[in-house]
């Protein structure tokens, strides 16, 4: 899978741009503030319906416009597919895939799987369990069609249960919701656990390439003691949950733990090593997606030279090339990327003040 055409209208400082990306490595270079990262952000927005740089989607709309428009043609195994998205300043979003209106943003994510490696993505190991759950759930969502529905139900039931707790409801009023919660929680946990097991098989070899002298152990924690019956736990913890006003244990507390010996990876490794570990996780996740559903991710790699030294840039770019996936990578100096590749980039784009030029 690859993008063969990308149109961007009124997205940050890009008033209008048309790109014809190539399979393989697409290098986008330009000075800071030129708009090169905005191209990556636009691709991400098209696949996720949101930005990876701002929680307020209205901020990505060009100041002179009331809406942004993104359009792409995807080359898929079954033929070409067209995706269009409009986001209005009012917050309304309009999405079409092959001319048909789409109501769920999850359909975008399913159509256009995206992996991001940016300076911010290295916070995967520092920001707490939420970002690591999102990492697991990205893979579980793509790997198992049952996951999205089960996780949606977990969130729905959890919201209802927490509301009852805040209202001080007796356990007899919560018991029905606990039966639902247990059913969906166990389904979500089984899918997550299976996904992490599959990821681990690939990850060992990739971590060995990036960090050959480090033994990293990766494990999944479900959000409650696996030796404890979840239904019994919820009943036994009712008083505690009532006191806090929320559900203390459950799949919403799951985590991906990475350890070196007895220490968490973030305490045992240097900042440079942690960056390589996150790169290994992203590479493994993309490779597993290809194995499981025969679909490539699209990789967005921002400001690579500032994050990794020349040796590790070369290693990451080799790993990305070996996946066979389409890659968009940005840099201020194109030589920092070109010199790290065994073959020239498939295509190069120069960005200046929001204007994009293809370099022949």
Curated annotation (Swiss-Prot):
PROSITE patterns in alphabetical order: RECF_1 (PS00617), RECF_2 (PS00618)
GO molecular function, one term: single-stranded DNA binding
Transmembrane segments: none
Annotated Gene3D superfamilies: P-loop containing nucleotide triphosphate hydrolases, RecF/RecN/SMC, N-terminal domain
Residue positions binding ATP: 30-37
Keywords: ATP-binding, Cytoplasm, DNA damage, DNA repair, DNA replication, DNA-binding, Nucleotide-binding, SOS response
Subcellular localization: Cytoplasm
Keyword Cytoplasm: yes
One Pfam family named in its UniProt record: SMC_N
Gene Ontology terms describing biological process: DNA replication; DNA synthesis involved in DNA repair; double-strand break repair; SOS response
GO cellular component terms, A-Z: cytoplasm
Keyword DNA repair attributed: yes
Family that this chain belongs to: Belongs to the RecF family.
Function, in words: The RecF protein is involved in DNA metabolism; it is required for DNA replication and normal SOS inducibility. RecF binds preferentially to single-stranded, linear DNA. It also seems to bind ATP.
NCBIfam families, sorted: recf
Record-given protein name: DNA replication and repair protein RecF
Organism per entry: Shewanella baltica (strain OS155 / ATCC BAA-1091)
Encoding gene, per UniProt annotation: recF
């Amino acid at each position: 899978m690859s993008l063969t055409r990308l149109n961007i209208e009124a997205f940050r400082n890009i008033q209008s741009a048309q790109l014809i990306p190539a399979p393989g490595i697409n290098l986008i270079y330009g000075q800071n503030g030129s708009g090169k990262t905005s191209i990556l952000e636009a691709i991400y927005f098209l696949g996720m319906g949101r930005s990876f740089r701002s929680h307020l989607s209205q901020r990505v709309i060009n100041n002179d416009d009331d809406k942004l428009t993104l359009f792409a043609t995807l080359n898929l195994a079954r033929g070409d597919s067209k995706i269009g998205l409009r986001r209005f300043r009012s917050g309304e979003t309009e999405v079409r895939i092959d001319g048909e209106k789409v109501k769920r943003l999850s359909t975008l994510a399913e159509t256009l799987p995206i992996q991001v490696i940016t300076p911010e993505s290295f916070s995967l190991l520092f920001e707490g369990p939420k970002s690591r759950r999102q990492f697991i759930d990205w893979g579980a969502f793509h790997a198992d069609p049952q996951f999205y529905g089960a996780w949606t139900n977990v969130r729905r039931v959890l919201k209802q249960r927490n509301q009852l707790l805040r209202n001080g409801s007796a356990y007899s009023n919560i018991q029905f919701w606990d039966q639902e919660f247990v059913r969906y929680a166990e389904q979500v946990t089984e899918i997550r656990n299976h996904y992490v097991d599959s990821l681990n098989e690939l990850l060992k070899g990739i971590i060995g390439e990036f960090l050959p002298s480090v033994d990293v152990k990766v494990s999944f924690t479900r959000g409650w003691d696996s030796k404890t019956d979840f239904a019994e736990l919820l009943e036994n913890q009712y008083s505690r949950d009532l006191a806090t006003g929320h559900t203390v244990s459950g799949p919403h507390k799951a985590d991906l733990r990475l350890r070196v010996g007895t220490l968490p990876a973030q305490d045992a490794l240097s900042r440079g090593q942690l960056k390589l570990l996150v790169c290994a996780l992203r590479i493994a996740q993309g490779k597993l997606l290809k194995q499981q559903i025969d679909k490539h991710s699209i990789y967005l790699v921002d400001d690579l030279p500032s994050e990794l030294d020349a040796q590790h840039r070369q290693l990451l770019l080799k790993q990305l090339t070996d996946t066979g996936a389409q890659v968009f990578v940005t840099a201020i100096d194109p030589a920092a990327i070109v010199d790290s590749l065994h073959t020239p980039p498939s295509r190069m784009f120069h960005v200046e003040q929001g204007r994009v030029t293809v370099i022949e």
